[in-house]
Amino acid sequence: MAFLTIAPGAFAQAPAPASLSAEDKALVDKAVSYLQGLTEARGRFTQTDARGATSQGELFLKRPGKARFAYDPPSGLLVVSDGGAVAIQDTRLKTFDSYPLMATPLSLFLARTIRLDRGVQVTRVSRAADGFTITARDGKKQTAGQITLTFADNPMTLRGWSVTDAQGRTTQVRIDGLERVSGLDPGLFVLKDPRPKNVGRGKL
């Protein structure tokens, strides 16, 4: 999967959750409060896959549930979450796939109510000079997922995330210039299946 390894079951096994200190918990609460208040935003993203290949594009967020990742040419990739499903269209490869939002890492910060103490297990909180990271897994599934969210301090900003798949390959997404906006076009978060009804899944 080209984008963020979002296919169901794509997560690697995560370590057992660590005991969080009071300072760790305060940072988790700070991150949750920030994400909960991030209702509409746009910015640029750079994705780096396990082979080191990079691609860029424009990101739109409209919480709860909605996101759009429009990749720059020559990539033909477009990823859209409409609140219930994440659709992935590749016009170059002529493919179209769809997954339940709740089966993807995006659900961690697109949920209506973000909870990192229910159904999600925080395994690590790490500090840096200009921010911090939170590593978490989905505690609801038999296959534990692992995603690391990166935040900057002063001002508080989501910098990006990384996901490791079942083969131990990591895909990283860095966000630049994320800004709060309002009135995003609802059409940004609609991606209809272009395939004729008699065409099998994945092929246009």
Residue ranges and their predicted role:
Residues 33-50:
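A short, Trp-centered hydrophobic/proline-enriched beta-strand micro-motif
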Residues 38-40, 54-56, 62-66, 73-74, ...:
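Extracytoplasmic
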Residues 14, 58-108, 171, 177:
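An acidic-aromatic
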Residues 117-119, 127-204:
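Gly/Pro-enriched, hydrophobic low-complexity segments
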